[in-house]
């Protein structure tokens, strides 16, 4: 769409009452038409939310647009060609005739923009997935048929997008959330920022989790046959396969010559030992989308105990050889280009990095080490061992109780209840609320933009219904119906968005374009261009719309706290507001019932290997520090704080608490986890260390009686 400078340009705002042009506003604020109606703190909060939004399954375009959405879309993750040229070589990571899927394709091209005296070569890394978070990621969506044009001796067109984020629509708009029917209503579920959400609506916010797991074998250890049978040894799922229901992605067993006769039988190799094996858990049912196997070639030159037993490495060797073949093709291509172009050869930095990595991965042309010398291959300063296996898998993340949602005005809340369609509040005509939030939240937070957005979308819905009624009037011929429908829309635009009305008068002059606009409204409703510098945006503009159209509201039928259906005495509004989901979810717990401890009796520090050694979290994300203790002491008696600190650090108290949790019929209702008559305070290991040092100096601590009786 062509943008005229006299309409959209910043030079036309001076002398106006509202000068909040999108070019004057910062990131985030220029996405909000009601930037001048929200408090500064809530506007800043929404800006911080932009970095917390995952890619969701079924996003939609917002009904009220500022015009910057497509500009945001230009800066999302894409796989695109940077310069004009010709594709020279295409290399797959895993050939499809040998493997089920191929997670990566490398397209090497020669640029045609650097003259004949410079041979500039680059590469496009076409990977099927993107991960920039500890678990949230997304699978790239192919852009049309552009991937089919990636062939040798085919032209490479600058700017051509091969694949992109699923958040972009066909027009390039960045879609972060979903336009949702919201109801602001006082319910027992909406207090304290609670959100009552519709299950079918939450399914639209399903996102993709992508994680990786690593196993290092060969240092007197090996992968057991978790996913194989008597004839095929598989230490992990195949590419394109899924992690089994038990959740174990890989299991590593130490090699013991004395126990090999019982630990390395076909039956024993297929059964994990939950006590002595190093288990690496993933997500049950997750699909493996990438596998990378690294190998230390220096171990091949000597016969030592660090090599994997024969036959056990057949799966690892197959993936390693396929990846090794791709890296050797890169090296062969580089040497071919050197012979062909000599000093005129210039490599794109990313291509240069890949060539360097290929030499390191394949150990190509390396200096032969003397017999008996030890030069070990490392990856990020960690020894590779005989084999280093990296699995990448994906799984669905479905929002649940505990997930956090927010409006584009910083009006966030936490899902506390999920309801079916018949449990959600609704109008008599069947309009169902997708979510229910506190009716006073926008007032208390001073983010009135949330109220204005809901009302504006309600008016747009009413005008859309007027257009549909006109188009169903059989007393008019087709041309008259379209003419009247377009006139209704233009009248609405003149009130709701004068800038959009003026823009359409200048650009949409042909009858066919007007018919096309009416058809788009009939198909998907009204989308308003409503920049934040619109005059009188907010309460004044809403008042004009209400005087002209009247705000349609109805009584709401809802399920009360007694499980009975009730009808509200007052009429209430159910209309669309744009809702985004934040990375806060309900399945990643921050605390644990019992922490993991060292053999010294104090809390253990978790390593990368320990993080996934059990299905759940071993330790809390944060232990109690000085600041937390002082806050607790300000509110609680000192003996309660001492008891809280004693339980995880006192071996006897910790053992008693674990036993109480395991043996309790309902672990959420334990009358007494630690009996202090049997296990008194003072067994904290940290206190015992201090007490021991003081004893060596002739000092002892004891409780003294208070004047009011009892001990202090």
Report the location of each language-model feature.
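Long insertion/accessory domains within large nucleic-acid-processing enzymes
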Residues: 1-712
């Amino acid at each position: 769409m062509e943008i005229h400078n006299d309409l959209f340009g910043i030079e036309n705002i001076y002398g106006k009452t509202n000068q909040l042009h999108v070019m004057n506003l910062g990131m985030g604020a220029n996405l909000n038409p009601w930037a001048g109606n929200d408090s500064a703190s809530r506007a800043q909060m929404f800006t911080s939310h932009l970095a917390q939004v995952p890619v969701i399954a079924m996003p939609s375009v917002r009904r009220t647009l500022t015009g910057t959405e497509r500009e945001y879309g230009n800066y999302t993750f894409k796989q695109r060609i940077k310069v004009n040229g010709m594709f020279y070589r295409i290399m797959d990571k895993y050939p499809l005739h040998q493997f089920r899927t191929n997670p990566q394709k490398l397209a090497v091209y020669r640029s045609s923009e650097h003259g004949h005296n410079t041979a500039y070569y680059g590469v496009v890394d076409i990977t099927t997935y993107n991960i920039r978070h500890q678990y949230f990621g997304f699978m790239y969506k192919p852009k049309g048929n552009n991937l089919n044009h990636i062939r040798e001796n085919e032209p490479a067109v600058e700017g051509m997008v091969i694949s992109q984020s699923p958040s972009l629509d066909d027009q390039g708009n960045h879609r972060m959330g979903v336009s949702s029917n919201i109801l602001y209503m006082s319910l027992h579920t909406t207090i304290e920022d609670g959100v009552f959400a519709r299950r079918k609506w939450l399914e639209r916010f399903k996102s993709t989790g992508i994680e990786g797991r690593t196993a290092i074998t060969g240092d007197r250890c090996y992968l057991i046959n978790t996913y194989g049978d008597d004839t095929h040894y598989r230490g992990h799922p195949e590419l394109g396969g899924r992690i089994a229901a038990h959740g174990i992605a890989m299991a590593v067993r130490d090699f013991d010559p004395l126990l090999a006769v019982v630990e390395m039988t076909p039956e024993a190799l297929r059964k994990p030992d939950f006590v002595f094996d190093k288990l690496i858990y993933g997500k049950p049912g997750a699909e493996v989308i990438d596998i990378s196997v690294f190998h230390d070639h220096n171990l091949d030159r000597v016969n030592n105990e660090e090599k994997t037993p024969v036959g056990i490495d057949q799966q690892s060797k197959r993936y390693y050889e396929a990846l090794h073949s791709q890296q050797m093709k890169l090296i062969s291509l580089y040497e071919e280009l050197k012979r062909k172009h000599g000093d005129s050869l210039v490599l794109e930095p990313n291509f240069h990095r890949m060539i360097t990595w290929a030499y390191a991965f394949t150990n190509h042309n390396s200096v032969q080490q003397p017999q008996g010398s030890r030069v070990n291959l490392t990856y990020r300063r960690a020894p590779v061992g005989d084999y280093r296996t990296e699995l990448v898998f994906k799984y669905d993340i479905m929002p649940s109780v505990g997930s956090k949602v927010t409006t584009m005005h910083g009006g966030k809340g936490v899902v506390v209840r999920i309801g079916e369609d018949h449990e959600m509040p609704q109008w008599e005509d069947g309009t169902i609320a997708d979510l229910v939030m506190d009716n006073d939240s926008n007032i208390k937070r001073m983010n009135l933009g949330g109220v204005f957005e809901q009302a504006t979308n309600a008016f747009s819905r009413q005008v859309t219904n007027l257009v549909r009624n006109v188009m169903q009037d059989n007393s008019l011929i087709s041309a008259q119906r379209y003419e009247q429908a377009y006139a209704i829309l233009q009248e609405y635009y003149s009130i709701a968005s004068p800038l959009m009305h003026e823009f359409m008068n200048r650009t949409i002059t042909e009858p066919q374009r007007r018919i096309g606009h009416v058809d788009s409204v009939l198909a998907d409703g009204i989308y308003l261009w409503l920049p934040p510098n619109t005059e009188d945006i907010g309460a004044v503009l809403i008042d004009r719309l209400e005087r002209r159209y009247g705000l349609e509201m109805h009584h709401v039928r809802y399920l009360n706290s007694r499980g009975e259906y009730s009808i509200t005495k007052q009429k209430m509004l159910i209309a669309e507001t744009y809702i985004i989901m934040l990375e806060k979810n309900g399945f990643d717990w921050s605390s644990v019932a019992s922490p993991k401890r060292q053999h010294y009796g104090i809390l253990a520090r978790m390593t990368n290997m320990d993080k996934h050694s059990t299905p759940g979290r071993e330790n809390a994300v944060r232990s109690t520090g000085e600041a937390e203790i002082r806050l607790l002491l300000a509110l609680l008696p000192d003996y309660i704080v001492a008891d809280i600190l004693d339980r995880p650090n006192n071996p006897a108290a910790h053992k008693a608490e674990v036993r109480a949790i395991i043996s309790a019929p309902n672990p959420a209702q334990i009358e007494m986890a630690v009996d202090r008559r049997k296990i008194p305070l003072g067994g904290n290991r940290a206190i015992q260390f201090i007490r021991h040092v003081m004893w060596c100096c002739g000092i002892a601590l004891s409780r003294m009686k208070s004047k009011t009786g009892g001990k202090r």
